[in-house]
Regions:
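Hydrophobic/aromatic residues within the transmembrane alpha-helices of Major Facilitator Superfamily
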Residues: 13, 17, 47-48, 82, ...
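Hydrophobic alpha-helical transmembrane segments of multi-pass membrane transport proteins
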Residues: 144-153
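Short hydrophobic "helix-edge" motifs at membrane interfaces and signal-peptide entry regions
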Residues: 8-10, 106-110, 155
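Membrane helix-loop-helix hairpins that form the core translocation module of multi-pass transporters
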Residues: 3, 33-97, 103, 152-163, ...
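Juxtamembrane boundary at the C-terminal end of a transmembrane helix
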Residues: 182-190
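Selected transmembrane alpha-helices and immediately adjacent juxtamembrane segments
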Residues: 94-122, 128
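Juxtamembrane transmembrane-helix termini in multi-pass membrane transport proteins
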Residues: 2-65, 124-144
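Short, structured loop/turn "capping" segments at alpha-beta junctions
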Residues: 86-92, 120-124, 136-139
């Protein structure tokens, strides 16, 4: 296993803790109660999003000197660290997937892809691909990191949604999100 893959997996899995896409995974699971198409939708959206980000990063890496890339990577990691301190919020438009005609899988792909646009994990993917010059290792690693962070949220949302009213599950998810945001804000456990 190569360095680009391992670092990409770890960086994105950590960056996803408390992120709005993790909350989105929980909300989608609670709403639809169909974990398999949601997991496949998250995987598909992540592969598409991170492949584009990885391609941009690989191109930037070929255009810039190693010194500039080292500084850019350092700045992106410091920026991600600061970004984690700012709690994300799940916009109503991102969470509102009831009006779609694409089914659970399609709703998940579209919603998750849009939620990831400009997100810290997408920016990390660009920076990592530029630094390591390993498109496949970075995209595979960042995708695995996303799945490590989001599949448990989907399974948790699905499991408890059967026992609890959806409204209560959404409330619990909101509280979890606020707690994770506060932890990130104060640097406790994140």
């Amino acid at each position: 296993v190569n360095q680009a893959f391992l670092i990409s997996t770890g960086a994105v899995a950590l960056a996803e803790i408390g992120d709005k896409t993790q909350l989105l995974s929980l909300v989608l699971a609670a709403r639809y109660r169909k974990p398999v198409p949601i997991i496949l939708g998250v995987l598909t959206a992540t592969l598409i999003n991170h492949a584009g980000a990885g391609a941009l990063g690989a191109w930037l890496g070929s255009m810039l000197t190693p010194t500039i890339m080292r500084w850019a990577l350092a700045a992106s990691f410091i920026g991600m660290g600061l970004w984690i301190l700012v709690p994300d919020k799940l916009d109503d438009e991102e969470a509102n997937t009831n009006r779609t005609h694409f089914g659970v899988f399609g709703a998940t792909v579209v919603t998750f892809f849009l939620a990831e646009m400009g997100d810290k994990t997408q920016i990390a993917t660009v920076a990592l691909a530029a630094r390591f010059h390993d498109f496949f290792g970075v995209v595979a690693g960042t995708t695995l990191g996303m799945m490590i962070a989001n599949v448990p949220a989907i399974l948790l949302g699905d499991r408890f949604a059967h026992r609890l009213p959806t409204r209560l599950v959404h409330g619990i998810a909101a509280v979890m999100f606020v707690v994770l945001g506060a932890m990130a804000l104060f640097g406790v456990g994140v």
